[in-house]
């Protein structure tokens, strides 16, 4: 959803898209939502991801994709988190080694102050990262303020 949203929903002065590109972007955005909802209704797994090569999509905003999944496809925070972790790992063929916190699996994870089951936006403020057994306390991520402002307009959580 993140890659299609800017061209489909942003003001053309922000996205620098023509009116035709915006109309096409909206068709793609609506199609992604329709396809995801139909697949969910039919029991077909839907994976999530972002595309940081696309304008307004960053390497640090997977939380937005989870939130958009809930906002536009109607899934719960719990299901969005499951999809972004264990289901994605399973679809990628690595669910036996990652994607959930279980004995024998890689224990890569993040720690936040809040509960993402209640508010996915807590994922934007990571307090700690554990990766390959190494703890990174208060990791600093260089963010793009202009992107944050524009994308925040479309998230259901602030």
Model-derived features: where do they sit?
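Active-site gating loops and adjacent loop-to-helix segments of metal-dependent hydrolytic enzymes
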Residues: 1-29
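Short, acidic/turn-prone active-site loops that include or flank metal/cofactor-
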Residues: 5-9, 74, 134-135
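Extracytoplasmic/secreted cell-surface and envelope-processing proteins
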Residues: 10-13, 56-59, 121
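His/Asp/Glu-enriched, well-ordered alpha-helical/loop segment
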Residues: 17-21, 28-115
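C-terminal cap of metal-dependent C-N hydrolases
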Residues: 84-86, 106-149
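Short, solvent-exposed cationic patches
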Residues: 152-158
